[in-house]
Amino acid sequence: MTIQQAIQHAITQLRTISPTARLDAELLLAHILGWSRAKVVAERDHVLTPEQEMAFNALIERRANREPVAYLIGHREFFGLDLFVDRRVLIPRPETELLVELTLKEAQRFNHTPLIIADIGTGSGAIAIALAMHLPHALIYGVDISPDALAVAAINVTRYRLDDRIRLLEGDLCTPLPAPVDILVSNPPYTILTEIDEGVYRHEPHLALDGGSDGLDCYRRLIAAAPTYLKPNGAILLEIGSTQAASVVHLLRQALPMAETGIERDLAGHDRIVWARNRYVIH
């Protein structure tokens, strides 16, 4: 069987469960062959060995059962990084890159070093690592309540040789932080489990997804802690579900009445990030 035949066969199996059936198939075959996806696309007439064909078919069967591609191949690209992921962590999403972009922009306000940032619910470490790679003078805390998630984050932190600038802390939301920080950033659980995609529900960790009956449980607790864990001129940036902006802004204004607040939209035009910048300064 040639690569072209294998891909076409896989597409027929995946098209009913994945809108990116061709991409999925090409990524999975690239993983089997140890090639780049570009080489798979270019070498359409290459003949697979029986062993390669069998391994590919096994992965396609798992993908047809809605297992995410990132778990099948063991990594995910995020903000130009190649991150190790498995079922212990939520798979980093493209829309979360906006959270990184806005945090990098916010960091430009601060001219002291080290800039101290806390990534609450760090998971795979994606946000913390992306920030550290672009902010060489920052100290970043990656906090997670899940020791399993922190084990994955540690692999990625070490891969990018950031052990000296990213400190991983186990605990609930802000409680492990040793002192107030300049920037709090978080992509907290904000989904209602009964409303999420079947494949996500079956395979990704519920601890990283479940936002409670209205999706706002973590926001309430995290934002309530912000006055304690933010420095007087600090900022908080939060990823949100597309219908949650007004509720989260309300929580921020209650907790930080002196703060400026704002909402940013993603490329699809959906509300995606809510932020607050604390204007209260101690003289």
From Swiss-Prot:
Keywords noted in UniProt: Methyltransferase, S-adenosyl-L-methionine, Transferase
Enzyme Commission number: 2.1.1.297
BP term (GO), one: translational termination
Protein function: Methylates the class 1 translation termination release factors RF1/PrfA and RF2/PrfB on the glutamine residue of the universally conserved GGQ motif.
Residues annotated for S-adenosyl-L-methionine binding in this entry: G121, T122, G123, S124, G125, D144, N187
Top-level lineage group: Bacteria
Upper taxonomic lineage: Bacteria, Bacillati, Chloroflexota, Chloroflexia, Chloroflexales
Protein name per its UniProtKB record: Release factor glutamine methyltransferase
Recorded catalytic activity of this chain's protein: L-glutaminyl-[peptide chain release factor] + S-adenosyl-L-methionine = N(5)-methyl-L-glutaminyl-[peptide chain release factor] + S-adenosyl-L-homocysteine + H(+)
Binding annotation for substrate: N187, P188, P189, Y190
Gene this chain is encoded by: prmC
Entries under InterPro entries matching the protein: DNA_methylase_N6_adenine_CS, HemK-like, N5-glutamine_MTase, PrmC_N, RF_methyltr_PrmC, SAM-dependent_MTases_sf, Small_mtfrase_dom
